A protein has these predicted regions:
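Amphipathic alpha-helical segments of the small helical/lid subdomains adjacent to P-loop NTPase cores
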Residues: 230-236, 244-315
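Domain-level recognition of nuclease-like catalytic cores that cleave nucleotide substrates
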Residues: 557-586
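Substrate-engagement module of ASCE P-loop NTPases
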Residues: 157-165, 192-219
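Extended alpha-helical interface modules used as scaffolds for assembling large macromolecular complexes
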Residues: 241, 300-547, 551-553, 581-586
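P-loop NTPase motor core
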Residues: 33, 67-131
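Walker A/P-loop-proximal flanking segment of P-loop NTPase domains
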Residues: 2-70, 78-87
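Structural recognition of the conserved hydrophobic beta-strand(s) that form the central parallel beta-sheet
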Residues: 172-174, 204-205, 219-226
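Conserved P-loop NTPase mechanochemical-coupling segment
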Residues: 16-19, 101-151, 179-194
């Protein structure tokens, strides 16, 4: 197709990676209208805490609120909001605040050097604030500001000046929890972190000044981040803020609903060369980007797509006229580096079962989601489960025995989780050859060579298990096999696939939307016998697996997914850490 076919005049551009609301609205970008939530935020408590995973639109949401409430954007209201929900239903507080926006993401998170960065960022931001609103503040403000040293003193001065001038402030803090990274990556930092967030610590003092400012000119505050740890440490005794992260009213505030994704695709299908129907694109995107639920009451009603990943997909699809070969953008991979820290901490737990190992093998975990908890309590199982949830590693999937049931939301998270799980195995001197894995993956997809592929997995598993006896067992065998198959770019490994006939251990669903020429797909029935089981147990499991594989292969779910590929039914039986059976059911 001619590249010029992809250039369409007057077509709205996609705001991929953009966080400036005015640019989106004034430069003909596509915008999913979330302004209906502004009245709800305004009616909520004045000090609003909100936690969401990275790349879910937090910074853009704050920017929208800044433009809506900033007194300096009053003349631009119709241009920015006129045709949106809030433009038709404005609230009394619109364009009535002096806005102070602090973004901690660019500050050095090292606890031994963060004060300098915090002072510099706050100092620069407060100076800009004073210049911007010079006509609304006393004339001596600029000179007096420069007699104050450090973020704490300058913030105190600022809200006192605004109070004297009869002005009210709206304070926004983005990535307030940036400093938590230090304690996740380095346990030795915990003591220093505790010092800084308790007692007379500098970070604690800054938030104490925020609290004090609420008795002066700080009338509203909106604070966002990705985890509740710092919130609990910094705001114990705050007593003025409310955490709305688990509120059903704000489940759809960030991210896209499927209806919003469909509306976007419908718009671009009318002005771009689409090779798929909207339904087909939804079917491709849904397993990768959907299935986030942020409120127990919303389970079964509405799930959310990761908005950044949707924009990445649609932009690449329009630019190249086909489904992107890499369904995960590189920035997401960088963000998930925190998983390496979490998995390392998970391995240090005193309780018997590794939470992540259980999640991978069982397919779900249960726990009570916490609004917040101190850093010293991260290793409490429920707190760790909550941390995984807030980071976007888990999603609400109903109730189980009176507790919240949580599962891996989608393939983006699953791939990252399995990748870093394998990386922790690498930490124990088990090395995986990338070239060898790539060659075996290609042979599996295009030549039907399943013996070499599963033999390689069994060899790696046996070598690893000999180094870490504690991990022996059915959960480990199943989890390790899943993690290895997740590295295969040609398949979407689905564990415990719910079909009309029951559950299948691993269905290697071919990614035909990307690799249309691949020719083989697989159902893998994986069985495990304990070391001490009698030898005839292996044969019993083999026969059981054959019967199950035959039933699964005949389901509509599998038939629809495999397209024209040849379906292999592979039975694998382990006894302990040794693979005793690996055969195809003919």
């Amino acid at each position: 197709m001619n590249p010029l076919d992809y250039i369409v005049q007057d077509r709205k551009r996609l705001p991929y990676g953009m966080m400036n609301f005015a640019d989106i609205r004034c430069d003909n970008y596509y915008y999913v209208d979330k302004t209906r939530f502004i009245p709800m935020i305004e009616q909520a408590d004045r000090f609003f805490f909100f936690i969401r995973p990275r790349r879910f639109g937090k910074s853009l949401t704050l920017n929208i609120l800044q433009h809506y409430y900033d007194v300096s954007t009053r003349d631009k209201f119709d241009d920015l909001f006129g045709d949106l929900y809030i433009g038709q239903h404005p609230t009394p507080d619109r364009n009535s605040y002096l806005v102070l926006y602090l973004n901690f993401s660019g500050i050095n998170a090292e606890l031994n050097d963060y004060r300098k960065g915090l002072d510099e960022h706050c100092g620069t931001t407060i100076e800009s604030f004073c210049k911007k609103y010079a006509d609304l503040l006393p004339p001596e403000t600029w000179e007096e500001l420069h007699t104050k040293n450090g973020a704490v003193a300058q913030l105190e001065f600022l809200y006192q000046v605004c109070e004297r001038a009869g002005q009210k402030m709206y304070l926004f803090i983005d990535e307030y929890d940036h400093f938590t990274n230090a304690i996740l990556s380095n346990p030795e930092s915990l003591r220093r972190y505790t010092d800084e967030t308790h007692g007379e610590g500098y970070l604690r003092n800054l938030f104490n000044k925020v609290k004090a400012g609420t008795y002066f000119s700080i009338k509203r505050c909106f604070i966002t981040g990705v985890n509740p740890v710092t919130m609990d440490d910094l705001t114990s005794g705050f007593n003025i803020g409310t955490n709305y992260s688990l509120s059903s009213k704000f489940n759809q505030l960030m991210g896209f609903t499927e209806e919003e994704v469909r509306e976007m695709l419908n718009y671009y299908s009318t002005n771009s060369p689409f090779r798929h129907t909207v339904d087909e694109l939804i079917e491709i995107m849904k397993p990768w980007y959907d299935n986030y639920c942020f409120a127990q009451d919303c389970y079964g009603e509405t799930t959310m797509y990761n908005s950044n990943m949707v924009l990445y997909f649609v932009k690449n699809y329009i630019d190249n006229g086909k489904v992107p070969q890499n369904m995960i953008e590189s920035n997401i991979r960088i963000d998930y580096e925190k998983l390496r820290m979490l998995i390392r901490k998970d391995k240090e737990f005193a309780h018997d079962a590794s939470i992540i190992q259980t999640l991978v093998s069982q397919g779900y975990i249960i726990g009570d989601l916490k609004d917040g908890f101190p850093a010293v309590s991260i290793t409490n199982p429920d707190n760790f489960v909550s941390l995984l949830y807030y980071f976007g590693m888990l999603t609400i999937s109903g109730m189980h025995e009176g507790k919240t049931k949580l599962t891996i939301p989608n393939m983006v998270v699953q791939e990252q989780l399995y990748t870093y799980l394998l990386n922790t195995y690498n930490d124990t001197d088990l090395s995986f050859s990338s070239y060898e894995k790539s060659e075996l993956s290609s042979a599996l997809a295009y030549r039907g060579d399943w013996q070499s592929y599963f033999g390689y997995i069994a060899d790696c598993l046996k070598r690893y298990a000999s180094q870490r006896d504690k991990q022996k067992g059915e959960f480990f065998v199943h989890g390790f096999t899943l993690a290895m198959t997740a590295q295969n770019r040609f398949y979407r490994p689905i564990s415990e696939q719910d079909t009309q006939a029951g559950y299948v251990d691993i269905f290697l669903c071919p990614m035909l939307e990307i690799y249309s020429d691949m020719t083989h797909s697989y159902i893998v029935e994986l069985k495990y016998a304990k070391y001490k089981d009698p030898e005839n147990r292996v044969e019993e499991l083999r026969r059981e697996a054959i019967a199950q594989a035959n039933r699964y292969a005949d389901t509509d779910t599998v038939k629809r997914a495999i397209g024209n590929t040849r379906l292999h039914k592979v039975v694998v039986v382990y006894k302990g850490m040794e693979m005793r059976v690996c055969e195809e059911v003919i």
